[in-house]
Amino acid sequence: ISLKRARGTANHTKYPHLTIGLHADRIDAYVTVPNGVSSSIRSRLFAIDANMFADRVHRVTAAIDKGIRRTNGLPRIGVIQRRYRTQRAVPTVDATLRFDPRTAFPSFPPTTPQIKQQPQWLDAVYSVMTSRNSNLQFQIGAEFPYHTCPILRTPKIVDVIERVWLACAPFVNPD
């Protein structure tokens, strides 16, 4: 879903946008930062120091966690590296990283099972997004597995997805 600042442009992949993913096992709600964003947008999002990036991710993750707490949804970050034989070809996926950003921070409420700390996942995202040599897409948001999220069968899921997207605002308007 294109955002206001992308209105009137021929290609929504020049700007961050809202994404809903419908999968066999889950529904995703993400803010997507596509490979095609301008260098000025990319630098405002990623060309900050690693601590500032981690702080932005922490704030967004805390807001997502609060917004989905009673749904059994899961905060997620995803990075995908793709290549295309031609502009209109189906992409070949070279790499995918999808993880719960709460693994990077010790300050979130306890979960069952307990989230194990692995801040290196976030370090890897920062490293690849600031030293990219390929077609990379970044996403932050939440996923809702069908088997654990009964809210998916109710209209309330629309409000939950809205809360996820609003929580991700620092990755849409980083200033």
Question: Which residues does each PLM region occupy?
Answer:
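Surface-exposed peri-terminal alpha-helical interaction modules
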Residues: I1-R5, T13, S107
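Intrinsically disordered, low-complexity regulatory segments enriched in Ser/Thr/Pro
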Residues: A6-H58, T130-L152
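Long, solvent-exposed, polar/charged low-complexity segments
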Residues: R82-D175
